[in-house]
Protein backbone atom coordinates (compact mmCIF):
# COMPACT_ATOMS: atom_id res chain seq x y z
CA UNK A 1 0.00 0.00 0.00
CA UNK A 2 2.81 2.46 0.77
CA UNK A 3 4.26 2.07 -2.72
CA UNK A 4 0.92 3.12 -4.23
CA UNK A 5 0.96 6.29 -2.13
CA UNK A 6 4.42 7.10 -3.49
CA UNK A 7 3.50 6.74 -7.18
CA UNK A 8 2.16 10.30 -7.66
CA UNK A 9 5.31 11.74 -6.11
CA UNK A 10 7.48 9.63 -8.40
CA UNK A 11 5.48 10.80 -11.41
CA UNK A 12 6.12 14.46 -10.57
CA UNK A 13 9.80 13.97 -9.77
CA UNK A 14 10.24 12.14 -13.08
CA UNK A 15 8.75 15.17 -14.87
CA UNK A 16 11.14 17.46 -12.98
CA UNK A 17 14.01 15.21 -14.08
CA UNK A 18 12.88 15.47 -17.72
CA UNK A 19 12.96 19.26 -17.41
CA UNK A 20 16.43 19.10 -15.83
CA UNK A 21 17.66 17.03 -18.78
CA UNK A 22 16.26 19.67 -21.15
CA UNK A 23 18.13 22.35 -19.21
CA UNK A 24 21.38 20.38 -19.38
CA UNK A 25 20.97 19.84 -23.13
CA UNK A 26 20.59 23.61 -23.52
CA UNK A 27 23.81 24.28 -21.57
CA UNK A 28 22.04 25.35 -18.39
CA UNK A 29 22.46 24.17 -14.81
CA UNK A 30 20.33 20.99 -14.89
CA UNK A 31 17.42 21.83 -12.61
CA UNK A 32 13.75 21.14 -13.26
CA UNK A 33 10.72 21.89 -11.08
CA UNK A 34 6.97 21.31 -11.06
CA UNK A 35 4.20 22.72 -8.86
CA UNK A 36 1.21 20.45 -8.30
CA UNK A 37 -1.97 20.39 -6.28
CA UNK A 38 -3.30 16.88 -5.92
CA UNK A 39 -3.15 15.38 -9.41
CA UNK A 40 -3.11 18.75 -11.18
CA UNK A 41 0.08 20.10 -12.72
CA UNK A 42 -0.08 23.86 -12.16
CA UNK A 43 3.35 25.00 -13.28
CA UNK A 44 6.72 23.77 -14.43
CA UNK A 45 10.07 25.23 -15.27
CA UNK A 46 13.70 24.54 -15.97
CA UNK A 47 16.73 26.69 -15.49
CA UNK A 48 17.23 29.09 -18.40
CA UNK A 49 19.46 31.83 -16.99
CA UNK A 50 21.98 31.60 -19.84
CA UNK A 51 19.41 31.60 -22.65
CA UNK A 52 17.41 34.46 -21.14
CA UNK A 53 20.41 36.35 -19.70
CA UNK A 54 18.32 36.69 -16.54
CA UNK A 55 19.51 35.78 -13.03
CA UNK A 56 15.91 35.11 -11.98
CA UNK A 57 15.28 32.28 -14.46
CA UNK A 58 15.52 29.49 -11.91
CA UNK A 59 13.33 26.43 -12.43
CA UNK A 60 11.48 26.93 -9.14
CA UNK A 61 10.67 30.58 -9.81
CA UNK A 62 9.35 29.80 -13.28
CA UNK A 63 7.19 26.94 -11.97
CA UNK A 64 5.82 29.11 -9.15
CA UNK A 65 5.06 31.98 -11.52
CA UNK A 66 3.22 29.69 -13.94
CA UNK A 67 1.18 28.16 -11.09
CA UNK A 68 0.25 31.61 -9.75
CA UNK A 69 -0.97 32.69 -13.19
CA UNK A 70 -2.98 29.49 -13.59
CA UNK A 71 -4.66 29.92 -10.18
CA UNK A 72 -4.92 33.72 -10.45
CA UNK A 73 -3.39 33.94 -6.99
CA UNK A 74 0.05 34.38 -5.48
CA UNK A 75 -0.95 32.08 -2.62
CA UNK A 76 -0.19 28.47 -3.51
CA UNK A 77 -1.55 26.93 -0.32
CA UNK A 78 -2.13 23.21 -0.74
CA UNK A 79 0.53 22.93 -3.44
CA UNK A 80 3.70 20.88 -3.60
CA UNK A 81 6.93 21.64 -5.42
CA UNK A 82 9.02 18.82 -6.88
CA UNK A 83 12.52 19.97 -7.81
CA UNK A 84 15.65 18.08 -8.79
CA UNK A 85 18.02 20.14 -6.62
CA UNK A 86 17.53 21.60 -3.15
CA UNK A 87 16.36 25.23 -3.60
CA UNK A 88 18.80 28.12 -3.27
CA UNK A 89 18.13 30.98 -0.81
CA UNK A 90 16.34 33.09 -3.45
CA UNK A 91 14.02 30.24 -4.43
CA UNK A 92 13.45 29.30 -0.78
CA UNK A 93 12.24 32.84 -0.16
CA UNK A 94 9.83 32.57 -3.08
CA UNK A 95 8.51 29.23 -1.79
CA UNK A 96 7.84 30.74 1.63
CA UNK A 97 6.21 33.82 0.10
CA UNK A 98 3.97 31.68 -2.12
CA UNK A 99 2.88 29.52 0.84
CA UNK A 100 3.92 26.26 -0.85
CA UNK A 101 3.07 23.49 1.63
CA UNK A 102 5.60 20.83 0.66
CA UNK A 103 8.94 20.77 -1.13
CA UNK A 104 10.37 17.48 -2.41
CA UNK A 105 13.90 17.70 -3.79
CA UNK A 106 16.07 15.10 -5.44
CA UNK A 107 19.58 16.13 -4.40
CA UNK A 108 21.11 18.28 -1.68
CA UNK A 109 22.92 21.48 -2.60
CA UNK A 110 25.62 22.91 -0.37
CA UNK A 111 24.54 26.39 -1.51
CA UNK A 112 21.00 25.94 -0.17
CA UNK A 113 19.68 28.15 2.62
CA UNK A 114 19.90 25.29 5.14
CA UNK A 115 23.58 24.69 4.44
CA UNK A 116 24.54 28.36 4.21
CA UNK A 117 22.88 29.15 7.55
CA UNK A 118 24.45 26.24 9.44
CA UNK A 119 26.49 27.59 12.35
CA UNK A 120 30.21 27.35 11.80
CA UNK A 121 32.83 27.00 14.49
CA UNK A 122 36.26 28.55 14.29
CA UNK A 123 39.13 26.09 14.31
CA UNK A 124 40.84 25.79 17.71
CA UNK A 125 44.22 27.49 17.96
Tell me what each language-model feature is.
Residues 5-26:
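Short, basic/aromatic recognition patches
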Residues 51-61:
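A short, polar/charged loop-to-alpha-helix boundary motif
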Residues 73-85:
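Immediate flanking context of iron-sulfur cluster ligation sites
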Residues 114-125:
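Single conserved hydrophobic/aromatic residue that forms the stacking wall/gate
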Amino acid sequence: MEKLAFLPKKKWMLRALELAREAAAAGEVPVGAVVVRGEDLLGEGRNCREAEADALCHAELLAISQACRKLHSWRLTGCELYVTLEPCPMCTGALINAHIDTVVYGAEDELSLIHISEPTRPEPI
